[in-house]
Amino acid sequence: MRNNSKISTLESKFPLLSVEQGCMVSKDADITVAFRVELPELFTVTSTEYEAMHSAWHKAIKVLPNYSIVHKQDWFIREDYQGRLSDGGLSFLARASERHFNERPYLHHSVYLFLTKTNKQRMAQQSNFSSLCRGHLLPKEITNKDEVMKFMEAVDQFERIINDTEQIRIVRMTEEELVGTNEKGGLLDRYFSLSEEGHASLEDIRLGADLVRVGDNMLCLHTLSDTDDLPTTVSTDSRYERLSTDRSDCRLSFASPVGLMLPCNHIYNQYLFIEDSDANLERFEKQARNMHSLARYSRSNQINEEWIQEYLNIAHSQGLNSIRAHFNVLAWSSDKEELRQIKNDVGSALALMECHPRHNTIDAATLYWAGIPGNAADFPAEESFYTFIEPALCFFTAETNYKDSLSPFGIKMADRLSGKPVHLDISDLPMKKGVITNRNKFILGPSGSGKSFFTNHMVRQYYEQGAHVLLVDTGNSYQGLCELIHRKTKGEDGVYFTYTNESPISFNPFYTDDYFFDVEKRESICTLLLTLWKSADEHITKTEAGELGSAVNAYIELICADHSVTPCFNTFYEYLRDVYRKDMEKRDIKVTLSDFNINNLLTTLKQYYKGGRYDFLLNSDKNIDLLSKRFIVFEIDQVKDNKDLFPVVTIIIMEAFINKMRRLKGIRKMILIEEAWKAIASANMADYIKYLYKTVRKYFGEAIVVTQEVDDIIQSPIVKESIINNSDCKILLDQRKYMTKFDGIQAMLGLSEKEKSQILSINQNNDPNRLYKEVWIGLGGMQSAVYATEVSMEEYLTYTTEETEKVEVMNRAAQLGGDIETAIRQLAIEKRNNKEK
C-alpha cells in the first residue's frame, strides 16, 4: 500500500514566492538577482587574462553588503548536433557536411549567477532548518526596505565592474527566462527536470536518505565542504600539458577538470557566503584563546590554535575578508552502470585539482534543494568552510565552449574539443566590430598541413553565400571543386583556365567596355609596364615612372578621342614608338636617355609586340568574361618558372579581378593567390600590391595570399610591408616543422605570446576517432583561436590533392559521362562502407 504521508507537492515545498521587478523573492524574504554569464572560449585565455578575470570577480564581490550570497551555477548538458538535413537550399557538399556532423555529441555549457540578499539568521541555519524539512511555508514580509535598496545599488555596481572587463559579460535574466512561458520552460523548470534548454517538463522528485532521483535520473553529488578536502595551494589557472610544448604554454582555469573537461551531464555549483568579516575574526580570536587554554590537554587543540592563528594573521596582515565557501558537482544518469562510471570520473576530475573527492550522500537532498536558482539562502551552513575571497575564486570556472558568430555570413569550422560545428565569420562581423580594418587574409602552412583543404573549404562556402571567387593557383588544388561547380551550373560557372603552349592565357590591359579609365586603372597599367621593363633588382627613378605615366595618359586620351584605334598593347607600343618619342624630342626641356631611356623601354617591350615571342599575351581580341562568372580558377603552373611570363600573367589576372570588382557593386569579391604571389614580391611591385590591397577593401572585396615556405616570408621585406601589414586576418596551420624558426615567424607576423602558444598547440592532441587538421585564425591581434577543419568524405574527395585519389575521382566521373557529383557520391559511400567493415 502506498504511503501518501511521505508525498508532498512541489507547490507546498517550493521555496520561491514570486518574481518581482526582475528579482526572485523567496518565501523567507530573500531577494535574488539572476544573471546569464558569458565567459571566454576554451583554449584562448592566457595566465594574465585569468588573473584579470579573478581580480574583476574579487572587486565586484567586495562591493556586496554583508549577508549576501554569490551562487555561480555552471550547467553542462550532453546534446547532439542537429544537422540542417531538411533544408532544401543546401548544395551537395553542404548537405554532405550536415550529414557528417549530424548527431555529433557535445557538452552544452550555460552559466548563471545568482546574487542573494538574506539575513544573519538564515545564513547560519543548518540542514535541519531547510525549507525542505519544514511543513507548509508561510511567506514572510520584507521588513528592511533600506537594506534591499542598498543591495540593489551594490548589484548595479557589481554588474558594472564585471562588464568593464574584456573577458566576462553578465546579463540580467528576465522573468520569462526564469519561470518560462507557455511555449518554453524557464530555468526553474529545467532545474526540476535536469533537462536541456527548451525541453523542460516537470518530473517527480524522490529525495531519499541514500539516493536523490529526478524523474528517471539518479543523482550523485561530490562536495568540497571542508578544508581537509582542499589542495594545499590554489591558483587562477594551470598548465594543460596536452596542448603545451617546451616552447609554449596552454592554460586552463584551475576548475577546468570539473567543467568542460568532465564529459557527462553535470552542474557545478560555486557558493561564496559574504558574512560580517570583523565578527568572524573576533569569534576566531575567542576560539584561539580557548584552544590555547586547552592546549595542554590535547595536541589537536594546540594544532587547531596554530591554524586559527595563521588564518587570523593572514587576514589582518593582508586585509582580507573572511567568508565561507562551498563547491559541489551534481552529476546524473538514468543508468546505474553509467552513474557508477560518472562517480569515478567526477572523483578523478577533483583529484586532478588535488582535492580529496568526497561523495556526499548525507546532505545530497538539501544541497540539491539549495541549488534551486534563488534558493541559496537555504544552504546548510555545516557544509561550508571558512576561507578568503581570493582563494575561493580560484574554484570558479572561467572558460566556455566555442561560440557561433552572430552573423548570417561565415564558414563552418569545428570545435577542437568535441568536434561540434561552429559558425565562424572572419570577414564581416570583425569589420563591423572594429576588430579588423580590412578583410584581407594571409595563410601560412607547410606542405601536408591541410592548407589546401582549408582554402577549398573556405572558398566553397564563400561561393555558396554569393561571393565572386577568383583563384590563382600553381598546383591544381581547386580542380575538383571547380569541376563540380562547372557541372552543377551546366557550364555557366566554375571556369578553369590552364596555361598551355597550345592555348596560352591572353589579356588586354587597355580594354574597358565604356572607355572609362580612372586613376587606379591608369596606375595599374603603369605598374604592369614597369614590371615588363625593369627586373626586380633594378631601381625605378621618379622621372622614369613619371614619363611612362605621361605616355599612358596620352595614349588613353588618343583611344578615347579616336575609337578607330583598337585599345591593345600593339597600338600602345606603336604610339610610344612613333608619336610619344617624337613629342619628347620637340620639348623645350629635353629628357635625356640617362633620365628616361625610351629606346631601352621599346627594346625590352618588343617581345610583347606583334611578331615577338610573347605577342599573344597582351593583345587578346576576346576579353575574358569575368563579370558574370562567380568561380574562376587560373592554373598557371606551366609558367611559374618563367621569369618573364610569370609576373605578367599574375599581375594581369589581378588587374582583371580589379576591373570585375569595380563593376560589381555591393557584391562580395575574393581573390586568392597561392604560391603565385612570389612573382609579384619584388621592390618594383611593392606599391602595386599596396594599391591592390587598398582597392580591394574599398570595393567589398578581400585579397588572400597563401604560402608554405617560411623562409620566403622571413627573408622578404616586401611580403611584410605590402602583404602581411595589409592583412588583418592571419591564418596559420601546423608549424611544428618550423618550431626552431618560429621566433622569426612570430616577429614577422607580429604575433603575441598568447597567439604563439595557440599556434604551437595545433594538432598536439587530436582525437584519433576523427579525421581533421587544426588551423589557427587570428583577427587583428584582438581575437584568435584554433579550430578544426573537419570535412565529410564527399568534401574530402572534392578537395583532395593526392594524385591517386584525384585520378580515382576523375576516372569514375569519366565512366559516368563526366558527372563528377555522382562519382564523388558513389566513392564516398564505398569508402564509408569499407571503413565500417
What are these regions (language model features)?
Residues 1-399:
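Extended, folded cores of ATP/NTP-driven motor/assembly subunits in large transport
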Residues 23-29, 102-107, 317-322, 414-416, ...:
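Short glycine/proline-enriched loop/turn "hinge" motifs that connect secondary-structure elements
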Residues 47, 51-63, 355-356, 366-422, ...:
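P-loop NTPase motor domains
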Residues 85-90, 127-132, 374-377, 484-489, ...:
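Short secondary-structure boundary/capping segments
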Residues 100, 516-570, 717-837:
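P-loop NTPase motor core of the ASCE superfamily
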Residues 132-161, 353, 445-450, 798-823:
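Short, cationic low-complexity segments
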Residues 427-460, 469-478, 495-503, 637-757, ...:
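Conserved P-loop NTPase motor cores
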